[in-house]
């Protein structure tokens, strides 16, 4: 028997145990425990229901095969088997995917950082276009996108912008967006009609509250300064902006988006908590630096995960060889086809690793 299926009965047993506990009035009266058990049961529900359906299909196949020796019932049994056997195979594939190890961060909100990189002003404008694309996708998913911090350029683009996206399973869908995004188009400032190539980089991190990871005050170094606007001019005479440094790792964040020092500090701590947690999750500085390099990117034109070709209305994801001739729709937030293909490719790779183990 496939080792994946050997563990399914354990999942069913645990699911039944959880439902018994949830029916206990004593547990129902403990809100925090009840919510934790409900969440665990909810995460198992699809797997259990699919497995029970699979078991029923196996039984139906066995019953139909028993009827093949009955001259009168054999034609109907064969007809049933023609339907049941493909259904069995489809359910087996579905169960293998459901039983893949879950990314513990998949249900988390995210912090996304977008930076204009190679290409000057045009790269900052493309960074703004990427933000609009993700904003529209978030709206279609009924998520909420809010800007944490931004540094505008004089042409109306972003040197860098950090946003928080909250909703259901945000990280699971957007974690593959990390990397360098290349655009090929004629800039608005181009008088000769020549196509230019520019790059913006995207970094995606799961959001970690301090309930997940505590930042010790003794490990923090903070500095308050005046908020600045585009071009570096001061727009606030009061020191409301904050810079936080996590001394053990050297990770630094600054926040000036809000009008008050308290709000800026709160946002800065959230961003810092995510970055520090991410750092320790990588085990050591070398792994962290390599991951950040591959996630956020250096901005070099040759380092890319996706190309957006405006003259040909084409978007290509180089990691999986996917090309779609509907860039206009993708930029309007219709990212589902790209994201679904990336998720399937990731699942396929994990299944191959599991089968080869």
UniProtKB/Swiss-Prot annotation:
Subcellular localization, as worded in the UniProt entry: Cytoplasm
One term under GO cellular component: cytoplasm
Keyword DNA repair belongs to the record: no
The keyword Protein biosynthesis appears for this protein: yes
SUPFAM superfamilies xref list: Release factor
PTM annotation, UniProt: Methylated by PrmC. Methylation increases the termination efficiency of RF1.
Modified residues (N5-methylglutamine): 233
Keywords: Cytoplasm, Methylation, Protein biosynthesis
MF annotations from Gene Ontology: translation release factor activity, codon specific
Protein purpose: Peptide chain release factor 1 directs the termination of translation in response to the peptide chain termination codons UAG and UAA.
Cross-referenced PANTHER family: LD18447P (PTHR43804:SF7)
Similarity remark: Belongs to the prokaryotic/mitochondrial release factor family.
Stated name of the protein: Peptide chain release factor 1
Native organism taxonomy: Bacteria, Bacillati, Bacillota, Bacilli, Lactobacillales
Gene: prfA
């Amino acid at each position: 028997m496939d080792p994946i299926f050997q563990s399914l009965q354990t999942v069913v047993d645990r699911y039944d145990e959880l439902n018994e506990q949830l029916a206990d009035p004593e547990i129902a009266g403990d809100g925090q425990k009840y919510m934790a058990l409900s969440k665990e049961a909810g995460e198992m529900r699809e797997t259990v229901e699919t497995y029970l359906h699979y078991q029923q299909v196996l039984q139906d196949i066995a019953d139909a095969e028993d009827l093949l020796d009955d001259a009168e019932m054999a034609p109907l049994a064969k007809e049933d088997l023609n339907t049941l056997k493909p259904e069995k195979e489809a359910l087996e594939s579905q169960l293998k995917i459901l039983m893949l190890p879950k990314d513990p961060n998949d249900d988390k909100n995210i912090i996304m950082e977008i930076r204009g990189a190679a290409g000057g002003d045009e790269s900052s404008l493309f960074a703004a276009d990427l933000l609009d694309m993700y904003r529209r996708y978030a709206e279609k998913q009924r998520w909420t996108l809010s800007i944490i911090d931004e540094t505008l350029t004089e042409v109306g683009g972003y040197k860098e912008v950090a946003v928080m996206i909250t909703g259901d399973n945000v990280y699971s869908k957007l974690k593959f967006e990390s990397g360098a995004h290349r655009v090929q188009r004629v800039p608005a400032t181009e008088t000769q009609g020549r196509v230019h190539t520019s790059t913006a980089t995207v970094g995606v991190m799961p959001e970690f509250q301090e309930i997940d990871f505590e930042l010790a005050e003794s490990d923090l170094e903070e500095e308050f300064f005046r908020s600045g606007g585009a071009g570096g001019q001061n727009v606030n005479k009061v020191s409301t902006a904050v810079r936080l440094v996590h001394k053990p790792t050297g990770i630094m964040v600054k926040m000036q988006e809000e009008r008050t020092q308290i709000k800026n500090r709160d946002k800065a701590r959230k961003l810092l908590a995510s970055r520090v947690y991410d750092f320790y999750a990588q085990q050591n500085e070398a792994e962290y630096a390599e991951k950040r390099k591959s996630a956020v990117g250096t901005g070099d034109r040759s380092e890319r995960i996706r190309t957006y070709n405006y003259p040909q209305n084409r978007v290509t994801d180089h990691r999986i060889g996917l090309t779609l001739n509907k860039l206009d729709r993708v930029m309007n937030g219709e990212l589902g086809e790209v994201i679904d293909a990336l998720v399937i490719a990731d699942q396929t790779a994990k299944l191959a690793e599991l089968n080869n183990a």
